Amino acid sequence: MANEVILLDFWPSMFGMRTRIALREKGVEFEYREEDLRNKSPLLLQMNPIHKKIPVLIHNGKPVNESIIQVQYIDEVWSHKNPILPSDPYLRAQARFWADFIDKKLYDAQRKVWATKGEEQEAGKKDFIEILKTLESELGDKPYFSGDDFGYVDIALIGFYTWFPAYEKFANFSIESEVPKLIAWVKKCLQRESVAKSLPDPEKVTEFVSELRKKFVPE
């Protein structure tokens, strides 16, 4: 049933995008509920009382929190279709390592690109580019991070792409000139229905980030 799975989310969240993609990769029907993060719903506060953050995946009334954990949960529960994590334990561990790298390194670096200015922004931009180059090196000449099949690391990373134009606008640089293979990977991912349906328009995200930046960077 469609209401068996509920996703509490916020449209420009690169973390929520992961869960949307994973559900669609598995063909799972779900009810999407947009959250107002300035006025969080009672359901969000009830289902994620520790962090009070989106996304929250609710399956048969039970919450699963943290996007990367949600992706693993979705892969395990709906295991009959489109495996997300590799079956080999070593390859699975490697995929988890790179997803963890994205969460620990990329998020903080990208935030400095759009939410700071001056020397701090330049340092953040340098870190951000180095992290993307590390990821591009790991991708190599493979179609996807795990090889021929779209999977866990791809899902962990692809949502950040929707923020790329905002990074470029506010930090005045070209991501494609720095990591062309990574952008080719982005274009390949966007051909997947699960991704295309789950990612918002990057221009709309840039408008959102423009407003958000005003709160962090006084003119």
From Swiss-Prot:
**Xref: Gene3D superfamilies:** 1.20.1050.10, Glutaredoxin (3.40.30.10)
Where found? Cytoplasm, Cytosol
For this protein, what reaction is catalysed?
Answer: RX + glutathione = an S-substituted glutathione + a halide anion + H(+)
Q: What induces it?
A: By dehydration stress, salicylic acid, ethylene, methyl jasmonate, auxin, H(2)O(2), copper, benoxacor, isothiocyanates and the pathogen Hyaloperonospora parasitica.
The UniProt entry, under Pfam families, shows: GST_C_2, GST_N
Binding positions for glutathione per the UniProt entry? S13, M14, N39, K40, K53, I54, E66, S67
Task: Select a single GO molecular function from the record's annotations and give it.
Answer: glutathione binding
All residue ranges annotated as the GST N-terminal domain in the record: 3-82
Q: Which EC class is the enzyme in?
A: transferase
Q: What InterPro entries does the database record attribute to this sequence?
A: Glutathione-S-Trfase_C-like (IPR010987), Glutathione-S-Trfase_C_sf (IPR036282), Glutathione_S-Trfase_N (IPR004045), GST_C_Tau (IPR045074), Omega/Tau-like (IPR045073), Thioredoxin-like_sf (IPR036249)
Q: Which residues form the GST C-terminal domain?
A: 88-208
Its main localization is: cytoplasm
Residues the record lists as Phosphoserine modifications = S198
Q: Which CDD domains match?
A: GST_C_Tau, GST_N_Tau
- Classification via PROSITE patterns: GST_CTER (PS50405), GST_NTER (PS50404)
Q: Name one GO biological process term.
A: cellular response to water deprivation
Relate the protein's function as given in its record. Answer: Catalyzes the glutathionylation of 12-oxophytodienoate (OPDA). In vitro, possesses glutathione S-transferase activity toward 1-chloro-2,4-dinitrobenzene (CDNB) and benzyl isothiocyanate (BITC), and glutathione peroxidase activity toward cumene hydroperoxide.
Q: Can you say what this protein is called?
A: Glutathione S-transferase U19
Q: What is the lineage of its organism?
A: Eukaryota, Viridiplantae, Streptophyta, Embryophyta, Tracheophyta
The protein's gene is named: GSTU19
